[in-house]
Amino acid sequence: MSNLPSEPEFEQAYKELAYTLENSSLFQKHPEYRTALAVASIPERVIQFRVVWEDDNGNVQVNRGYRVQFNSALGPYKGGLRLHPSVNLSILKFLGFEQIFKNALTGLSMGGGKGGADFDPKGKSDAEIRRFCCAFMAELHKHIGADTDVPAGDIGVGGREIGYMFGAYRKAANRFEGVLTGKGLSWGGSLIRPEATGYGLVYYVGHMLEYSGAGSYAGKRVALSGSGNVAQYAALKLIELGATVVSLSDSKGALVATGESGITVEDINAIMAIKEARQSLTTFQHAGHVKWIEGARPWLHVGKVDIALPCATQNEVSKEEAEGLLAAGCKFVAEGSNMGCTLEAIEVFENNRKEKKGEAVWYAPGKAANCGGVAVSGLEMAQNSQRLNWTQAEVDEKLKDIMKNAFFNGLNTAKTYAEAAEGELPSLVAGSNIAGFVKVPQAMHDQGDWWSKN
């Protein structure tokens, strides 16, 4: 990669995977997979285009649009669209690369991709967002389709934006097909899709608790970051299962519970309304049971916690914050966001797992812990293909099965390729990375994307 422009986010994601594979027995048993990794690390296709739209004052505005179609060996490209001023090719390549292996862990037939634009929806009128989405889809529709590439939502892209984009696609392509997921229920969407990533995260961590002998969620104190869909629905499910939610956050700061009762369902409903109006948590009218900490992430302010769930954005847990969580008694960390922990933070957690054995913290990477969102997107694709709608109970049951399989697949793969010392919990980061990876080179080899020397 030395001859290419610096892509720090993508390089971090690549190095994390490569480090895991090199430090397992996978390459000893299958040295040819080094070739597969080199091939899989380059996207099949990168589409970059301009998006020209008109603001409410009649002025011409222009943004950069992208779609990284990373790997289609397991199925159509699948991954979200992100609208945020920070969007660039490095971030989308990192997200698309992670998406390949996350999608593989679901067991569904989906490849990996990611897209978006450096457009900031904050402060924009509904009409401006509609005009931008239509202009964005005017180019993107040429490159996607129900059996080619099926985008979904991500940061800055919710049900409203998916609706505008789907309408623009339908008009441009003259087809009504399952080309986007996260659609409205009356026009091809799936029940539990908005809740899926948060619910799936909670289901996954439930298996971590059970396997390690820590019991249920009842009485556990849980720190969350973020206040979007993932954090909102994870918090609601945690409260339903008896846990105490002690924090939420956004880019302006953190809400931290000061009393024993934690953040309540009523608080979360109010936060949902704030976020629906595209406002900051600074407008939340908090009572005495929570405090607002300006400009902070929650990890060093939550006091004693049992579980930490980063659900905001990449690299939101630093080495110092990881050490702070250990000092606060945290025993479980699972990423609801993609690459939520820095490499240094992961190293802190993994070293603790090896040193403290049964008393250690247990860390789960986002590609496994947050795969519930794309899993239900895959279930939405299946429903669209059959022109059927499953009940909420049916979708939730399938989601639970997928998260259970993702957990045990990573766990058992770790036991095979990254053996733990006696009394040590298996490495879920190693197991999940390897389990997600091995499916992809096998399919690529069968399809002639790489080959071994005779």
Curated annotation (Swiss-Prot):
It catalyses: L-glutamate + NADP(+) + H2O = 2-oxoglutarate + NH4(+) + NADPH + H(+). Signal peptide: none annotated. GO terms for biological process: glutamate biosynthetic process. The modification N-acetylserine is found at S2. It holds the Pfam family ELFV_dehydrog_N. The active site is at K114. Keywords: Acetylation, NADP, Oxidoreductase. One of its GO terms (molecular function) is glutamate dehydrogenase (NADP+) activity. Its EC number is 1.4.1.4. SUPFAM superfamilies: Aminoacid dehydrogenase-like, N-terminal domain, NAD(P)-binding Rossmann-fold domains. PANTHER family: NADP-SPECIFIC GLUTAMATE DEHYDROGENASE 1-RELATED. Homohexamer. Belongs to the Glu/Leu/Phe/Val dehydrogenases family. This is NADP-specific glutamate dehydrogenase.
